[in-house]
Regions:
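Short beta-strand elements bearing conserved aromatic residues within extracellular beta-rich modules
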Residues: 46, 219, 625-629
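A short, amphipathic beta-strand motif
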Residues: 27-35
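Short proline/glycine-enriched turn/loop motifs at strand-loop junctions of beta-rich domains
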Residues: 42-43, 195, 215-216, 618-624
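Ser/Thr/Pro/Gly-rich low-complexity disordered regions
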Residues: 581-687
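N-terminal signal peptide
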Residues: 16-26
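Non-catalytic cap/lid and distal C-terminal segments of serine-dependent acyl enzymes
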Residues: 52-94, 100-583
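Classical eukaryotic N-terminal signal peptides for Sec-dependent ER targeting/secretion
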Residues: 1-13
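Short, ordered, surface-exposed loop/turn motifs in non-cytosolic proteins
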Residues: 39-50
Length: 687
């Protein structure tokens, strides 16, 4: 892998990423569990952190800056009398072995601590069975979340020779204290209302049916000055501010930004530079709480891996809010906005539901077009970690004197995520994209688009991402019954900087090229600002200026406005991302349906002489196959490697007068159970 290509690389990336191994110095770490900590056996993920001596191991675990050495291992049916041992490590057995980051000699002095994120068994309504960490008002952290087991932090020296370190899980991370009166306990948090900031939470029937357990979604509702709950005649447009886990905070820094909070509460924007005070826009601003099993938010859409979160929010939570608060429940008065993850959610919410929302103001959104998934040409590259010329692909960057400095590569960040979870369960960025954009694998977990160790891209898996490629989705539904070419014209506003720290400008540029190439230069309003990095409001506007922009759009597109939003563009026929379609195409049933056994192409009985032709069957992308002929129920000849789609030949010999023949193919893949499949049997007789 080439590490340099005219770009500066931060010191953490100067040495190309290698696989970390705890056992390079014959080091073993044994972790037991204290009395009365567990109520039964559990599955989960152990995370072991070696931090610099005297440093809190959780102080900095970020991929771009951590000084720690971190290791992870899955445990199965771990109980009171069990000991989990971490030693060695390597890329070939991520399901049961040790994953480590980064690679250095272990000799030195450290503060060491271990954590165990417990998994809960879930049997989903489509028949799939998975083991996942369900968050509980903590925003689904990748380590040390509610319910996690922890050991005391211990200062010690690693000698560099054979050594055994013993730790004990002796405590459990507690639930945050309840202060509100919401249902559902700690799920989605529990907060007390204030005069302007109200909290709601509902049990989602749709999500609960999918997951086979009670599931909740919530919202933080910021009311404008002068709001009177009893005045049903005065109603307000709504700005849905999409973001990561918001906890108890209000949107736009309400309750944390003193100046904004004071101005919002008074309904008066203080004048600056001699300008007079002016009234604040009269909006209700809503932030959703939808922490999910794979991340701190669900991405607000219906997915095969996380279920009908889009329907839970749009068809259950929003109607509940409309019933309880004085909103204008019309598309023109419902605006989506957000940045980064929230940028993608806001754009997707409008694009999938133009019948429900009026417009989106989406800033530096996650990849809108997978021709540029961050910096990965996902449809054309063979590897997600390096280009054809061998250059590493960056994931996180900064700029110094207008020179790009790569802080982490895609390979480095993916390998870092493997410390915290396999099968896309790290609760981190690349893994949640697998869960949101992709289908289910046969193992029940997200069908990953590439090998997380090597970066090899699986084109068939990538095909299942296309319904979530918003550029492709719009183009594919441009002039059919959804008629998105007319329905969405003038309703999409996107902003990004050319120096986006996560390379998200590439996806925006590809989206603009696709949709404005079809609809003309003003079909979508796309702003790509030279030199700007990740962050800030839409077009880097000051907050009150931006909120006024949104308010003006609503007024202009109201029934009495200058350009009313026509009801012919908000019909239900334009709706997409229907859960029944999503689960049919990408759920457990679809995973089962795409599997095929090996086949012999002849009828049940043939004469000896002709060459027998066989295929290996169909398997999930990334499964490595080995085959063997079975003659009269016994293996015949050596195992040989095959690939899906290969035509396999067998030439009968005169050794047997008459015999039965079948092909046995064994498939292996990281985080899948090894599986052997037999073909049909044919009987072969001599001429």
């Amino acid at each position: 892998m080439t590490c340099f290509s005219g770009i500066r690389w931060a010191s953490l990336v100067v040495a190309c990423l290698s696989w970390a191994a705890l056992g390079s110095d014959n080091l073993r770490v044994q972790i037991s569990v204290g009395d009365n900590i567990l109520k039964g056996n559990i599955d989960g993920r152990v995370v072991l952190i070696f931090a610099p001596n005297g440093t809190d191991p959780l102080e900095d675990t970020d991929v771009t800056s951590t000084p720690n050495k971190m290791f992870g291992k899955n445990v199965f049916q771990f109980g009171d009398n069990d000991i989990v041992t971490l030693s060695g490590g390597g890329p070939n057995n991520t399901a049961t072995g040790v994953s480590g980051f980064p690679l250095f000699s272990m000799a030195g002095t450290y503060r060491v601590q271990a954590f165990l994120n417990p998994y809960n068994k879930a049997r989903r309504s489509d028949g799939s069975e998975v083991y996942l960490k369900f968050p509980c008002g903590d925003g689904a952290p990748n380590v040390d979340g509610v319910g996690s087991l922890t050991t005391p932090a211990m200062d010690l020296e690693v000698h560099g020779g054979p050594q055994t370190i013993k730790l004990t899980f002796d405590s459990v991370v507690p639930v945050e204290a309840f202060v509100g009166k919401e249902i559902g306990g700690c799920s989605q948090g529990n907060y007390a209302d204030t005069e302007r900031l109200k909290y709601v939470k509902i049990r989602s029937k749709k999500l609960s049916e999918f997951w086979g357990r009670d599931m909740y979604v919530g919202a933080n509702i910021l009311l404008p000055a002068g709001y009177n709950a009893a005045d049903k005649h005065t109603r307000y447009p709504v700005l849905y501010d999409q973001n990561h886990w918001t906890g108890g905070r209000g949107a736009y820094g309400y309750s944390t930004n003193a100046a904004f909070t004071a101005a919002w509460d008074k309904g008066i924007i203080p004048g600056t530079n001699g300008a007079p005070d002016r009234p604040a826009p009269k909006l209700i601003i809503i932030a959703f709480r939808h922490e999910a099993p794979y991340y701190d938010d669900s991405y607000g859409v219906n997915t095969a891996n996380m279920g009908p979160y889009g329907d839970a929010i749009n068809e259950e939570l929003i109607p509940y809010i409309d019933e309880k608060f004085n909103t204008i429940a019309q598309p023109y008065a419902r605006i989506q906005d957000g940045g980064s993850t929230g940028g993608w959610i806001s754009a997707a919410s409008l694009i999938f539901r133009p019948d429900l929302f009026g417009a989106c103001f989406s800033s530096y959104p996650d990849s809108l077009d997978f021709n540029s998934h961050q910096a990965i040409p996902l449809y054309t590259n063979k590897n997600a970690y390096q280009n054809a010329d061998g250059d590493s692909i960056g994931s996180i960057r900064t700029f110094e004197n207008n020179t790009e400095v790569v802080l982490a590569t895609v390979a480095q960040e993916n390998h870092w995520e493997l410390v915290f979870g396999t099968s896309s369960r790290s609760s981190l960025q690349w893994d949640v994209w697998n869960a949101v954009f992709g289908a289910q694998g046969l193992n029940g977990y997200p069908l990953e688009p590439w090998d997380k160790v090597t970066g090899e891209i699986y084109p068939e898996a990538v095909e299942y991402w296309k319904p979530m490629d918003l550029s492709n989705y719009v183009a594919s539904n441009w002039n059919n019954t959804k008629n998105l070419g007319e329905v969405l014209r003038g309703r999409i506003y996107i902003y990004v900087g050319t120096h986006d720290n996560y390379y998200l400008n590439g996806g925006v540029a590809a989206f603009e090229k696709q949709v404005n190439g079809l609809g003309g230069p003003n079909w979508a309003n796309v702003t790509i600002t030279p030199g700007q990095t990740h962050g800030g409001n839409y077009q880097r506007r000051e907050t009150w200026d931006y909120l006024q922009l949104v308010y003006n759009w609503i007024q202009d597109h109201s029934p009495k406005g200058t350009t009313p939003l026509s009801t012919k563009f908000t019909k239900p026929s334009s709706r997409g991302n229907k859960f029944e379609d999503v689960i049919q195409a990408g759920g457990h049933g679809a995973a089962l349906k795409r599997q095929q056994k090996p086949t012999l192409s002849y009828k049940q009985s043939v004469k000896c002489g002709p060459t027998i032709k066989a295929t290996a069957g169909r398997w999930d992308p990334g499964v490595t196959l080995q085959a063997q002929w079975i003659v009269n129920g016994r293996p015949s000849g050596a195992l040989f490697a095959v690939k899906q789609g290969d035509l396999i030949n067998y030439s009968p010999t005169a050794k047997y007068q008459r015999f039965e023949l079948k092909l046995r193919v064994t498939g292996t893949k990281r985080n899948y159970e090894d599986e052997a499949r037999d073909s049909n049997i044919i009987v072969i007789g001599r001429r």
